[in-house]
From Swiss-Prot:
It comes from Thermus thermophilus (strain ATCC BAA-163 / DSM 7039 / HB27). This is S-adenosylmethionine:tRNA ribosyltransferase-isomerase. GO terms for cellular component: cytoplasm. It catalyses: 7-aminomethyl-7-carbaguanosine(34) in tRNA + S-adenosyl-L-methionine = epoxyqueuosine(34) in tRNA + adenine + L-methionine + 2 H(+). It is found in: Cytoplasm.
Amino acid sequence: MEGLEAYDYHLPPEQIAQEGVEPRDMARLMVVYREGPFRVAHKRVRDLPEFLRPGDVLVFNESKVIPARLLARKPTGGKVEILLVRERSPGLWEALLGPARKAPPGTRLLLLSPKDLAPVPGLQAEVVAVEEDGVRLLRFQGDLVAHLEEVGEVPLPPYIKAKIPMERYQTVYARRPGSVAAPTAGLHFTPELLERLREMGVELRFLTLHVGPGTFRPVKGDPEKHEMHAEPYAIPEEVAEAVNRAKAEGRRVVAVGTTVVRALESAYREGVGVVAGEGETRLFIRPPYTFKVVDALFTNFHLPRSTLLMLVAAFLGRERTLEAYRLAVAEGYRFYSLGDAMLIL
């Protein structure tokens, strides 16, 4: 296993996308092949049907981003920013706080409206415990879920400086609230493109993996020692059956995004295939991982030294991945969450 510097590349800051392309499927698409000599095709996302075939199973993550960034004030007047991680039980949330050191157990927090920073009547929280990695357990008084749209904001990645509307950071098929960041590969799909794929005989299937704040967490030091945050996933029975049937019949399983890869690979059992149901994954995919389920991957261009880039390197090969990234930089592709896409076949 190589060190962190083996997953580095140079990216001019102006190639970090600050907004999405409209229409969504007009984003550029680099098609890269895993086998044979290095070759690519430069296309648009709307050209995707050219590279898929009837019987392919295209798997999406239908998790929906929640407005997970909250502002609060302590009774002493100090401001606190809350990033919701997930609801453990009704009214009890795992969260990251900043500045965290000033919020020990027993700290009471008044939630503020992001519009005028006035306290929201009847909505407050108490820090009840501090867990590993600095995660706080917060007990909310009042119905937080009912007020989330009113008091919460989209927790955009730190490299996006512009304010973007919530719907632009949401896939068109998002249905199950729970992610604190978008499963960004899916942002490229339009209802029209999905319909074209359906009509040509591609099977569209949907699972859920709620993206946690660990997606923003950089790898520091030795990748071997990096620990992933647990993320919950759910794979419906009919999706597991469709994937297993495709594998048995020699048809391709195409993952839309790294979250789908991690959910499917986590749910795989030797001799059984993908097992339906709910679970949690801390799976960190990096070379020399052997893929059991996924045959092709549609994904964005990821940050240097990130777990996502390592996953792509495991799938495509590290040298070939970095060669493709260098070419993408030279060709002016747009990078990260709102940027262009890559299809690995």
